[in-house]
Amino acid sequence: MDWSQTLNLPKTDFPMRANLAQREPQFLKFWQENDIFKKMLEKNKNNKKFILHDGPPYANGDIHLGHALNKVLKDIVNKYKSLQGYYTPYIPGWDTHGLPIEQQVIKKLEVNRHEVDPVEFRKKCKEFALSYIDIQRQQFKRLGVFGEWENPYMTLDPKFEARQIRVFGEMAKKGYIYKGLKPVYWCPSCETALAEAEIEYQEDRTYSIYVKFEVIDDKGLFSNLPIGDKKVYIVIWTTTTWTLPGNLAIALNADFDYSLIDIGNEILVVASELVERVMKTNKIEQYKEIARFKGKDLEYVKCKHPFLDRTSLVILGEHVTLEAGTGCVHTAPGHGEEDFEVCQRYNIHVIVPVDNKGYLTKEAGKFAGLFYEDSNKEIAKELEASGHLLGVEKITHQYPHCWRCKNPVIFRATEQWFASVKGFRDQALKAVDDVKWVPEWGRDRIYNMIVDRQDWCISRQRIWGVPIPIFYCKNCRKELITDETIDYIAKIFEKEGSDAWFSKDVKELLPEGVKCPVCGCSEFEKETDIMDVWFDSGSSHAYVLESREDLEWPCDMYLEGNDQYRGWFQSSLLTAVATKGRAPYRIVLTHGFVVDGEGKKMSKSEGNVISPFDIINEFGADILRLWCVSADYTTDMRISKDIIKQLTEIYRKIRNTARFLLGNLYDFNPKTDKVGYENLKEIDKWALQRLYKLIEKVTKAYEEYDYNQVYHLVHNFCVIDMSNLYLDINKDRLYASKSESLDRRSAQTVMYEILIALTILIAPILSFTAEEIWQNIIFKEEDAESVFLTRWPSINEDILRDEALREKWDKIIEIKDIVSKQLEIARNEKLIGSSLDSKVKIFAKCDIKRFIEENKDIIQEVLIVSQLDVEESDSDQIKVEVYKADGSKCERCWKFDTMVGKNEESLNVCPRCYEVVKSK
């Protein structure tokens, strides 16, 4: 007889093989065609809001793994909050202005940006940006990320640009915007100023040089010293030889000691603490100190520039340290922030002997026309020939590079527009402390950055961006910016976009009758610079959160990579504090970078770049989503094919658990078949308690944004509590009991609860799989169209806190673990095959023996053995003996029983199976 026909074997359309890459698009279609995201919002529209404001990715290429990690983490936050009942509108955004797009368009059109019509050029830039928004939009949707994809925000949107102009106007009105000559990061390749957030540091090997500046006016300090006719030189040290044409001073520290060192034919001045190191580096063996002065004594000593007809004044500065060099700092106010500031105090004028493209100007004398990098060698040769080069040293140091073109940048003093951070620094620091930073070290990171940061250079010498809305009087050159002009321009931009600045005449951009407040002239010129793109994205909170009715300012969360402490987190904070006095966010959550399997940075040159679509097309988006939580995302995340393959195994275990549950619920309708708690079998009560513990821990982990903990909790529950224990134990009563028996319905009742809860718990992370499970649940108490339209599972506190139940089952599982080891030994010795082939005898001391006897049927069921005996022992340790089971094997349930075959029809089944078969 085919006994399988009499068993309740699992039935489900939920496939064992996931085939995610092929199946996921079906669910994307389902979500889109059924407006699931819209219905999620509708379901919670009257509830408390949770607003995550999207940091806009740059619209200039396919998405990379960093983008994928970022968007998936945001999606997890939003989906969890929505399932908890929060109203969670999510507006994706794009950063669309700036240098990278300009460069791509220049390359594509093969044009010179200085010669091209700006309006036509901007049109091409816009087309380029929009084309990549469409590409990235589809790529983000393929990840399973929910959002208002057809209604995103873009920094090129006319209304966005208008709001940005108003933010600028508000800051100007408060006196935070000014124009000044200051050294800024300058990219000669891109011919524009850069902000700190646009700088990347790379390790460079270079030469540092020691240069002698001859003292020509010692203020009489050295007149009584035994110097004779020997010349005195102050020795400076620099790693940027090309800046020497800009030298106007030598800075000393007022409190340091400086030694005059006789080296035989001349006298050198260096910081006393550094004498030995300087002499050793420059291979000077014979020397002696002849005098010592405080730095403040040497103030206003004059030196002769080594190759230009100019003097260099000795000045004092607190920035001078003894960490490297000579303690005498080469000072070129046109090439350094500290140099500039210290020279300002001495009224030393600024010269900048380097042009926009990085070539030395006539102020560099004979080196004019050389590219700054090429001048290093030529200047060093000149110094050596004239006897001013004391020595050369090869060093490795971190040097700033342009984040866009990757070329080295220079410090160069130019006229730029700045936002004065000084004016609201204290407010910004207070705002930092009002925010929750995850991880906590983020607070110190951004706090220290704001403490130390200089004023924000917001002007760029480019075309594709939002113009700085300022005019200049043609007569007296006074800047014009008023509430009236800002409002007028903003209204034009609202209708026509910022292209209007480039296409319209000045008079069309100004209200009628506007005159210069200084000289009364009515003729004006437009500012030609545009705003830093960080001002664009940094203003997004003002446009997105305030202009959409369903959002609110401030938002609940910003979530980006940890490079954004000096980028978007900071630019948003500064514009918000400057205009509103507080941060635009309540929580800031950060993640690390994506690196390869060995922890190395990904780069095309290394050949170790993995595209998100390499993973999606082979393994599916859910595997990529699982990777996003498979490690601590607040640090750098490793990825490789091997790592992904390991994750597919973990995914398979979760999927198989769901499949087993689905397969055994094909005939269970919770509306009619559910068993009340008081009638549940004890093992089912225990499983329910384990489920509630899981829900409690997973909920806490989601609340704390600890998604790696969610991953481990769910995986362990599926493998340890379910597959290895509860579901394995349940197979007999699920398959072999009467289909409608209390025994089977009890198991199904709890398995149904487990399936529903587990599906919802994984939905924020494994969104496609959770939806697939949900659609395969035949009968549901709550017939929600999608898993995302249901509610977060609740907990019965009484069951969860039932300590007697927990303690009892801890003991039972401890006994099972001991017995399982002995069964494994017996299996290896070929004494038994399946555990049902065995009879187990347990030897235990009195109290444990009594416990086993009182719960013998339960323990035998948990052990999955055919027979169980227990005997008393004096030992504190439980001893287990395994024997072949008594009786014959039931052909239906495979348990051994001495009563097999002893029935009216002489069927080779046990009494339980006979009763079931007979009833059918």
Curated annotation (Swiss-Prot):
Short sequence motif named 'KMSKS' region, residue ranges: 601-605
Gene3D superfamilies: 1.10.730.20, HUPs, Ile-tRNA synthetase CP2 domain-like
Top EC group: ligase
Entry cofactors: Zn(2+)
Entry binding sites for L-isoleucyl-5'-AMP: E560
Stretch forming the signal peptide: none
EC number(s) from the headed UniProt entry: 6.1.1.5
Sorted UniProt keywords: Aminoacyl-tRNA synthetase, ATP-binding, Cytoplasm, Ligase, Metal-binding, Nucleotide-binding, Protein biosynthesis, Zinc
Localization terms from the record: Cytoplasm
The UniProt record lists the keyword Endoplasmic reticulum: no
Positions contributing to ATP binding: K604
Record field: catalytic activity: tRNA(Ile) + L-isoleucine + ATP = L-isoleucyl-tRNA(Ile) + AMP + diphosphate
One example GO MF annotation: tRNA binding
GO terms under cellular component: cytosol
Assembly and oligomerization: Monomer.
Domains: entry comment: IleRS has two distinct active sites: one for aminoacylation and one for editing. The misactivated valine is translocated from the active site to the editing site, which sterically excludes the correctly activated isoleucine. The single editing site contains two valyl binding pockets, one specific for each substrate (Val-AMP or Val-tRNA(Ile)).
The protein, known as: Isoleucine--tRNA ligase
Organism (species): Caldicellulosiruptor bescii (strain ATCC BAA-1888 / DSM 6725 / KCTC 15123 / Z-1320)
